[in-house]
Design a protein with these regions (language model features):
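Single conserved hydrophobic/aromatic residue that forms the stacking wall/gate
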Residues: 1-13
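Glycine-rich phosphate/diphosphate-binding loop of Rossmann-like nucleotide-binding domains
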Residues: 17-81
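Glycine/Thr-rich phosphate-binding loops of Rossmann-like dinucleotide-binding domains
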Residues: 28-30, 109-111, 189
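Short, glycine/charged-enriched secondary-structure capping and boundary segments
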Residues: 33-36, 74-75, 114-118, 164-167, ...
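Gly/Ser/Thr-rich active-site loops/lids in small-molecule metabolic enzymes
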Residues: 36-50, 119-138, 172-178, 204-220
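Short, charged/polar "capping" segments at the starts of alpha-helices
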Residues: 66-69, 159-161, 187-189
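Glycine-rich phosphate-binding loop
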Residues: 80-153, 159-183
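Glycine-rich phosphate/adenylate-binding loop
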Residues: 144-146, 163-227
């Protein structure tokens, strides 16, 4: 891995500092139960490894993952909840990071009032009040305004044109540099592209596979001075 990194770094215009959020997040129901969304973290780990091997300074802010992290990544911070992940990102933003890639699956809704201890079993229906969780890309907008910012947008049951439109709307609302958009129903279909890169001008580009995704993000980061 070290040899690959040295070779890759020679191709960089300048090594960039990049933060990648990845994995799933959870919200406590009580001390032993949680509401959690689904994300293996595989895309984030793959991207982190790709950027690191090309000479960039990579920090991973990881939620819960089922895909193993490359052992040679230098800095992995574990943040299993939306709140802890946001706090960590806000702290890191003080270091003047060059690029942010928001690949984590952050819960849109969290439990309003987690119970202390363990709720008793077999007590009939359990009703949970869920409240909206802060959008990380919005909360970090001011702190990261001078950085390359790339988000991920997952939708389901929408046409490709609508998917692209929603990704572009996210770029405009949150001040992103680009968004990687894909549909849930396409994720397990190998005949479908890995996703679409939508830029700040509304143009979109097909990403055939994960390698194409990694290379596209690398290019955006390395050309940041030209944007």
């Amino acid at each position: 891995e070290i040899t690959e990194r040295l070779v890759g770094s020679e191709m960089c215009i300048r090594d960039r500092s990049a933060v990648i959020t990845l994995g799933a997040t959870r919200s406590a129901i009580d001390d032993v139960r949680h509401v959690q969304n689904t994300s293996s973290g595989a895309t984030g780990w793959s991207l982190a490894g790709h950027l690191y091997k090309h000479g960039h300074d990579v920090t991973c802010v990881a939620g819960l993952t089922t895909s193993a992290a490359p052992e040679w990544l230098p800095l992995v911070l574990t943040c299993p909840t939306p709140d802890s992940m946001l706090k960590e990102c806000l702290a890191i933003a003080n270091d003047g990071i060059d690029a942010w890639i928001h690949a984590a699956a952050v819960l849109d809704y969290v439990v309003e009032a987690p119970a202390e201890g363990k709720l008793a079993s077999q007590q009939g229906t359990l009703n949970l009040a869920l409240v909206e969780s802060p959008k990380h890309i919005m909360e970090l907008q001011k702190a990261c305004k001078d950085a390359v910012r790339i988000g991920f947008k997952l939708e389901s049951g929408v046409k490709q044109a609508d998917l692209i439109h929603r990704a572009y709307a996210q770029i405009q609302k949150a001040g992103m540099s680009a968004v990687i958009a894909n549909r849930l129903e396409d994720m397990s279909d190998r005949s479908k592209p890995r996703g679409y890169l939508v830029d700040r001008h509304g143009a979109h580009f097909v990403l055939a596979d994960t390698e194409a995704l990694n290379t596209a993000i690398q290019t955006l980061i390395e050309r940041s001075g030209e944007m």
